Amino acid sequence: MKEHKEKGVDLGLRQFIKSLGYVAGGTALLATTPWLTSCTPEKLQEIKHEKARIALIGTGSRGQYHIHNLKEIPHAQIVAVCDNYAPNLQQALELCPDAKSYTDYRKLLESKDIDGVIISTPLNWHAPIVLDALAAGKHVFCEKAMARTLDECKAIYDTYNQSDKVLYFCMQRMYDEKYIKGMQMIHSGLIGDVVGLRCHWFRNADWRRPIPSPELERKINWRLYKESSGGLMTELACHQLEVCNWAAQKMPESIMGMGDIVYWKDGREVYDSVNVTYRYSDGVKIAYESLISNKFNGMEDQIL
C-alpha cells in the first residue's frame, strides 16, 4: 500500500474525541480495530460539559497540525497549550488565543479544567508526560512512537492498565480506512496466507532544522541525537512495522539488522540508513529498509 497523505491522523484524533463520549457512533470502526478498546465505557467517566477540554503539550509543527484538526471538530475545545520553546508557544497562542499558556507541562496537568492532553513533544519526553498525565487523571493522545525505550513502553502499558483513562497513540495507518479495509481482506483469507512482508521508506531530507543559536542545536534538532531519538526506526519504521504485525496478527520473535551514517556526515548520532529483518515464529519474515538520501522509490508496504 502506498501512502502520501495523513488522513488517518485526523480520523485517529476524531476517534479520540469520540472516546471521551462527545460523538455518537464509531461501532463499525471499533469492531475492526481492537486497539481502540481504550474507549470502552469502563475506561470512561461521565463528563458534564458540552465539549472535550483539550490541552496541547508540545506546539511545534506537529502540535500545530493537531490544533488545526481540533478546530474542525465541534465537540473539542482547546483550553491550554504548553511548550518550553517560546517561538512555538507564541505560534500556538496565535492559533488559539483563548487558551491558557504554560511552559511547564506539570503545571498544566494540575488544572482541573482539562479532560485530555495531546502530546507532540520530542520522543524522549513521551514516557514521562504520558505517565504524569495518566497519574493526573487526564485522557491521553500521544504522538508516535510510544516511547524511546522498551522499559518506558512497559511502564506506560502497566500504568494505563491500572487507570480508568483513554490512551491513544498516533499511528496513522491504524486509523486509515484503506488499511482497515485491506486488513479485513487479509484476515478473512480472501487473498490467502501471509507468507512475507516487505517495506521501505526512502526520502531526500537531512532532518535538520535551522537554529537561532548553537546552544539550541540538540533541542531543536532532537531527531539527530541518541538521547532524544531512535532515528529512522522510531520516526518512520514504526508505522510500517505496525502494519506488518497487524497483517500477521502476531509479534516477531527475533530480529537482525544494521545501520550506518552513510550520507549525512554532519555530526548527527542516529543512522541515516538502516536494513532490518524480523522473523515470526512460523518463519514469515519482514524485510525493512529506510534511508534519507534518495527518495526515488518512495514509501511502500507490501504484504505477500
Language model region names:
Residues 117-118:
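N-terminal Rossmann-like NAD(P) cofactor-binding module of classical short-chain dehydrogenase/reductase
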Residues 1-15:
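N-terminal secretory signal peptides
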Residues 281-285:
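Glycine-centered tight beta-turn/hairpin loop motif at sheet-sheet or coil-to-beta transitions
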Residues 58, 62, 162-169, 173-268, ...:
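Predominantly a Rossmann-like dinucleotide-binding segment in NAD(P)-dependent oxidoreductases
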Residues 122-123, 127-175, 189:
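Beta-strand-loop-alpha-helix segment that lines the small-molecule cofactor/substrate pocket
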Residues 100-104:
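Conserved SAM-binding strand-loop segment of SAM-dependent methyltransferases
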Residues 20-96, 176, 244:
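N-terminal Rossmann-like dinucleotide-binding module
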